[in-house]
Curated annotation (Swiss-Prot):
This is Mu-conotoxin MIIIA. The keyword Secreted applies. Its main location: secreted. Expressed by the venom duct. One of its GO terms (cellular component) is extracellular region. It comes from Conus magus. It is found in: Secreted.
Length: 22
């Protein structure tokens, strides 16, 4: 269970660019 359902959680570029998913 990570941010955006990706292993890197919010540290990945996609999640940094889409912070609202957190």
């Amino acid at each position: 269970q990570g941010c955006c359902n990706v292993p890197n959680g919010c540290s990945g570029r996609w999640c940094r660019d889409h912070a609202q998913c957190c």
